[in-house]
């Protein structure tokens, strides 16, 4: 009996350790209907942005949303609209951490926002090329740039494929892919 209790306690400890490790992981799998993309995020460089992203992921927020904006030779953007181009309700905006030294180079992951530098919520984009004009160059709102918080480590071919999709205007939004790119899920690995 005592050995069984020890075995149960050991298994419980291992399960809790594995769950804790998964929560600390900085690697995520973005499953789409067009293929999978694996990303790595950088909490030491963009702690608030990564915490924000992890919160949305843990709540299943991105499941069923789409990459709603695709601009060839620029970027692909998702994380805010469903298949019917209805915007999903988000949490409050976060502070822009674009001064972290990370650059908007090809296959980096950055926060999308409005003209207000501190308006990013759930939407993100993947740079298809080096987009230096999106980098932080100063503290004024016209120079603050877009916060990079991760990069694609697998599935660059999928990113490139999505980046070449034909687009149209739908519900007042331009650059919407004609072929839907659905985020089935984003899972922490």
Which residue ranges define each predicted feature?
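Bacterial N-terminal signal peptides that target proteins for export
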Residues: 1-9
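Bacterial N-terminal signal peptides
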Residues: 8-17
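Cyclophilin-like peptidyl-prolyl cis-trans isomerases
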Residues: 7, 20-189
């Amino acid at each position: 009996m005592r050995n069984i209790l020890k075995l149960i306690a050991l298994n419980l400890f291992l399960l809790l350790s594995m769950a804790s490790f998964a929560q600390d992981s900085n690697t995520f799998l973005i499953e789409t209907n067009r293929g999978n993309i694996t990303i790595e995020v950088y909490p030491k460089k963009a702690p608030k942005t990564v915490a924000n992203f992890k919160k949305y992921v843990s709540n299943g927020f991105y499941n069923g949303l789409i990459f709603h904006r695709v601009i060839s030779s620029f970027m692909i953007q998702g994380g805010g609209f469903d298949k019917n181009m209805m915007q999903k309700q988000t949490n409050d905006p976060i502070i822009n951490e674009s001064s972290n030294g990370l650059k908007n180079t090809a296959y980096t992951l950055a926060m999308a926002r409005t003209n207000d530098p501190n308006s990013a919520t759930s939407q993100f984009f993947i740079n298809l090329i080096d987009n230096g004009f999106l980098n932080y160059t100063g503290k004024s709102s016209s120079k603050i740039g877009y916060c990079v918080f991760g990069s694609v480590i697998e599935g660059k071919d999928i990113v490139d494929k999505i980046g070449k999709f034909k687009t149209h205007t739908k519900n007042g939004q331009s650059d919407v892919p004609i072929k839907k790119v659905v985020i089935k899920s984003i899972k922490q690995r």
